[in-house]
């Protein structure tokens, strides 16, 4: 803040001391006389008494080396050193002031001070009654004879704006509000979200919000309120009354421990293939991966918290600061590397553009539309997390390199970023898992599978029998590949889920068929044991043939091949047995459906459930 002397107010004060008409004199612009050789004013060596206008500890401020007199030195040399028992100088900060004359009690002068000013008062009742002339001469000298350099800022007791209590209080309030908003977001998340299920995250975020609120209230009540009323700013009081206290240090240490526990839990969750981690605290019974994670995580966390605790109580050790920052950056680098590795290892196939089936027209508009539909949620989320990771690196290094003792409060931003990273990583894992489940539903269940997809089988391979495999191979090899092409994309096929074809049978229908065959077998057994049918020797072979025939039917049926094979290939048996009329009708319908099958598109997949859901609407 640029401090300047209001000479008009000073002349009014001189009038208050008895000079009539002095308040009408206006302050003139200081002009450097051409023949004046600047020189330092006289000063008493060894004078250690504090000036009367120094109501706060001095604060050094850089001033350019200009050959001029300092205003404070002039006041000290011309007034205080000569008349130390009669004159006093005080600093008036900005505000409203009212002046009245001792001789004229009915007349008062009201002024509004926008800048700090000096108030010089001398006692007229002393032995020397000429202080009015002394003050008048002093005002004339500083206006006409000297090039005055204003150095009064060091007596105001006001820090620079980035280090002032206004900035500290504002930043602490923003951090407090942001932490409570994070906790509110965690509470309002759905029940299947990781941030909602994990109680460790709740404890960490809630504890951080509570301690920020408590210390913000303490800062306002103890420091900011008193400094606001006295109109000065002193950041060293915040360091001594808040940061240097034992409760503040203990709370910071506990918050750092909770942060390490959350990060270890995240890494353990990623290593356990996205299942609920099982904690077995007996070392020799732990799994290998869990044992490595717990051992390395506990070692790094212990080293980090020991260095952090020593740094809280011993801030002057530079070597300790360097080791602590190196350990902190090492932990963060390992954590981010593990997050990136497991994200790519487990979710790369849903993040790569190759997995999205592009339409055959090759238009850029179509490709961009498909990419937008697939990645409009994941790409902004990944970019946001990468930005937060980079910001944490920058703030940690910047504050460690350029922060002094009185700026320790700036590390509260680093602590806020730790809380934000913990919540963001759990949110990222949840979004990727949800997308993985959504893509799995769209690509596997209840839709036609494109045989060009590398994740599914080749239809020419014999899966159900030697004869069927040879026949299907002959059909697919003789078919022209360019006659029929799929005109639908994976997105269109997944969004239009149709009802199953008549050739597909659900497990309930299969059970009904088994019961029906079982009843037929019982009736055949009873019919074979009837004496009227024939002799015992003649009926026994027929009964055995019937039993062996229906025992094969009662076995677990594999997928029937009659829906893909022509009538003459399935309707005739090698042993010359005939097919039932119902089965014959079923074969004719299946052959009709099989004639319209493309070589690039197989029939609908057979599901384990009884229904085919429309997953586009079920989300």
UniProtKB/Swiss-Prot annotation:
Residues 33-54, 485-506, 520-586 are annotated as: Disordered. It is a multi-pass membrane protein. The keyword Membrane applies. It is found in: Membrane. One of its GO terms (biological process) is protein processing. One of its GO terms (cellular component) is plasma membrane. InterPro entries: PalH. This is Protein DFG16. It comes from Saccharomyces cerevisiae (strain ATCC 204508 / S288c).
């Amino acid at each position: 803040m640029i401090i300047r002397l209001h000479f008009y107010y000073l002349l009014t004060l001189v009038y208050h001391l008895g000079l009539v008409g002095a308040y009408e004199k206006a302050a003139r612009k200081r002009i450097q006389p051409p023949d004046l050789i600047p020189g330092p004013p006289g000063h008493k060596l060894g004078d250690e008494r504090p000036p009367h206008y120094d109501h706060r500890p001095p604060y050094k401020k850089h001033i350019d080396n200009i050959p001029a007199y300092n205003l404070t030195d002039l006041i000290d040399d011309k007034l205080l050193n000569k008349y130390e028992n009669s004159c006093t100088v005080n600093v008036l900060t900005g505000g409203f002031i009212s002046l009245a004359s001792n001789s004229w009690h009915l007349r008062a002068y009201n002024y509004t001070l926008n800048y700090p000013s000096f108030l010089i008062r001398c006692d007229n009742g002393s032995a020397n009654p000429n202080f009015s002339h002394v003050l008048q001469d002093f005002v004339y000298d500083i206006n006409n004879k000297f090039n005055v350099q204003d150095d009064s800022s060091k007596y105001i007791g006001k820090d620079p704006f980035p280090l002032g209590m206004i900035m500290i209080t504002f930043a602490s309030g923003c951090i407090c509000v942001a932490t409570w908003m994070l906790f509110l977001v965690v509470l309002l998340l759905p029940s299947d979200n990781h941030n909602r299920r994990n109680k460790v995250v709740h404890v960490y975020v809630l504890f951080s919000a509570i301690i920020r609120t408590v210390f913000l209230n303490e800062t306002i009540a103890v420091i900011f309120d008193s400094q606001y009323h006295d109109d000065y700013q002193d950041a060293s009081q915040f360091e001594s009354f808040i940061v240097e206290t034992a409760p503040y240090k203990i709370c910071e240490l506990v918050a750092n421990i909770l942060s390490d526990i959350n990060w270890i839990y995240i890494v353990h969750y990623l290593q356990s293939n996205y299942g609920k981690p099982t904690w077995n605290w007996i070392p020799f019974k732990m799994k290998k991966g869990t044992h490595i994670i717990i051992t390395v995580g506990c070692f790094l966390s212990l080293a980090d918290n020991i260095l952090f605790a020593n740094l809280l109580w011993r801030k002057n050790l530079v070597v300790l600061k360097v080791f602590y920052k190196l350990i902190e950056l090492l932990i963060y680098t390992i954590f981010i590397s593990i997050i990136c590795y497991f994200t790519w290892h487990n979710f790369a196939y849903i993040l790569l553009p190759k997995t999205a089936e592009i339409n055959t027209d090759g238009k850029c508009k179509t490709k961009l539309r498909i990419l937008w539909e697939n990645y409009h949620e994941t790409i902004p989320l990944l970019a946001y997390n990468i930005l937060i990771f980079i910001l944490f690196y920058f703030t940690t290094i910047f504050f460690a390199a350029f922060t002094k003792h009185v700026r320790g409060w700036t590390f509260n931003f680093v602590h806020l970023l730790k809380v934000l990273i913990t919540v963001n990583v759990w949110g990222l894992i949840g979004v990727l898992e949800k997308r993985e489940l959504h893509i799995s539903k769209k690509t596997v269940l209840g839709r036609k599978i494109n045989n060009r997809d590398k994740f599914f089988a080749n239809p020419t391979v014999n899966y159900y029998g030697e004869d069927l495999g040879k026949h299907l191979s002959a059909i697919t090899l003789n078919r022209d590949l360019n006659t029929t092409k799929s005109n639908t994309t994976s997105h269109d096929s997944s969004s239009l889920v149709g009802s199953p074809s008549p050739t597909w049978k659900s497990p309930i229908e299969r059970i009904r068929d088994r019961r029906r065959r079982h009843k037929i077998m019982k009736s055949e057994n009873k019919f074979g044991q009837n004496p009227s049918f024939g002799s015992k020797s003649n009926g026994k072979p027929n009964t055995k043939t019937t039993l062996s025939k229906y025992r094969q039917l009662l076995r677990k049926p594999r997928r029937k091949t009659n829906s893909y094979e022509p009538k003459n290939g399935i309707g005739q048996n090698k042993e010359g047995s005939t097919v039932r009329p119902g089965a014959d009708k079923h074969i004719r319908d299946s052959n009709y459906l099989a004639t319209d099958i493309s070589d690039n598109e197989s029939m609908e997949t057979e599901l384990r459930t009884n229904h085919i859901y429309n997953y586009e609407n079920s989300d």
